[in-house]
């Protein structure tokens, strides 16, 4: 039987989130398999995949020749190759770009819609899953595989789990958790990713930013020691010549409408407002608060005031759960 996504509810901030099971239908899975899969991927993404163990998942960027990201990927080893999770809106163009040089390599690159992506977060998430799986991932071992299921562990903004599994297990999980967990859709996971400062690259922002403009260096997503990959020269230049002047920021406050991906905001300058930044993602929480993930200059004053264009409400900067010092 097919697996049906859960209906939406207004998302909640991590500090107040009850136990919640989410369908992650705005995210999508893809795989690379074959004898050359590690070597091929190593030449295409910013992370050092040759150093990855079975116990790790990594954030990485897949860039064009100018170092601009087609997408960012949550990578893990899968079977005899690798799998990654990215926003569904960018998967098709990202895979088309990744396949461009694959004709000379023994690899198969494909979308994977057979498996289901679920998120578990909120109050006592670990205890709830411990009743179902014999082993759970943790800080020391961030990926655990059990049967048809792969579990990924995330620390921020509060402990949570991403589950990659087959339809039968997804239905079993839903049945077991239905009584104690709230059910929600991708918007809740998106809200948690915004709070965690994990960059969200949707179609509107694909091909727009170098990885450092979205804090990937602070999230362990760029290796400056590995060999060549597409876009490496520009990514290295941004680090060693200080060419990157942008960073990912978290804003909270209120707005009469949600800004869309690719839209700019306005920064208060004395009595006036000046357009600034590019929105990556925004969500309205159940308490009415709006959270916005935006790329702006990396030297913003911490007490700066922003607004959605021409709006009467304001947004301010919230600290991210990680440091931008490399």
UniProtKB/Swiss-Prot annotation:
Family matches, as PANTHER family: TRANSFERASE CAF17, MITOCHONDRIAL-RELATED
Lineage: Bacteria, Pseudomonadati, Pseudomonadota, Gammaproteobacteria, Enterobacterales
Keywords, sorted A to Z: Cytoplasm, Folate-binding, tRNA processing
Molecular-function GO terms, alphabetical: folic acid binding
One Pfam family hit: YgfZ_barrel
Annotated function: Folate-binding protein involved in regulating the level of ATP-DnaA and in the modification of some tRNAs. It is probably a key factor in regulatory networks that act via tRNA modification, such as initiation of chromosomal replication.
Cellular localisation: Cytoplasm
Binding site for folate: 27, 189
Cellular component terms per the entry's GO annotation: cytoplasm
Family of this protein: Belongs to the tRNA-modifying YgfZ family.
Annotated signal peptide: none
Superkingdom classification of source: Bacteria
The protein's name in its UniProt record: tRNA-modifying protein YgfZ
GO BP field: iron-sulfur cluster assembly; RNA modification; tRNA processing
InterPro entries per the UniProt record, alphabetical: GCV_T_N, GcvT/YgfZ_C, tRNA-modifying_YgfZ, YgfZ/GcvT, YgfZ/GcvT_CS, YgfZ_barrel
């Amino acid at each position: 039987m097919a697996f049906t996504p859960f209906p939406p509810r207004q998302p909640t901030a991590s500090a107040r989130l009850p136990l919640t099971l989410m369908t992650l239908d705005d995210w999508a899975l893809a795989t690379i398999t074959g004898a050359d899969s590690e070597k091929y991927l190593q030449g295409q993404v910013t992370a050092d995949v040759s150093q990855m163990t079975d116990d790790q998942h990594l954030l990485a960027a897949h860039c064009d020749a100018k170092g601009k990201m087609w997408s960012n990927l949550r990578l893990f080893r899968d079977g005899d190759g690798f799998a990654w999770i990215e926003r569904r809106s960018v998967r098709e163009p990202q895979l088309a770009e990744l396949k461009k040089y694959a004709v000379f390599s023994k690899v198969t690159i494909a979308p994977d819609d057979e498996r289901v992506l679920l998120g578990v977060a909120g109050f006592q998430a670990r205890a709830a899953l411990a009743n179902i799986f014999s082993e759970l991932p943790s800080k020391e071992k961030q990926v655990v595989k059990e049967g048809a299921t792969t579990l990924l562990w995330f620390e921020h903004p509060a402990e949570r789990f991403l589950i990659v599994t087959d339809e039968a297990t997804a239905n079993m999980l839903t049945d077991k958790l239905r009584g104690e967990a709230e059910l929600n859709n991708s918007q809740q996971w998106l809200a948690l990713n915004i709070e965690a400062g994990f960059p969200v690259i949707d179609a509107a922002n694909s091909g727009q930013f170098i990885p450092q403009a979205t804090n990937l260096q602070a999230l362990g997503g760029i290796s400056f020691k590995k060999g060549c990959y597409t876009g490496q020269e520009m990514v290295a230049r941004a680090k060693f010549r200080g060419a990157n002047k942008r960073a990912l920021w978290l804003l909270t406050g209120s707005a009469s409408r949600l800004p869309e991906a690719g839209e700019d905001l306005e920064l208060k300058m004395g009595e006036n407002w000046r357009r600034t930044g590019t929105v990556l993602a925004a969500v309205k929480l159940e308490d009415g608060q709006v959270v916005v993930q935006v790329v702006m200059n990396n030297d913003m004053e911490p007490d700066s005031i922003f607004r959605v264009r021409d709006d009467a409400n304001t947004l301010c900067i919230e600290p991210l759960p990680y440091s931008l010092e490399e």
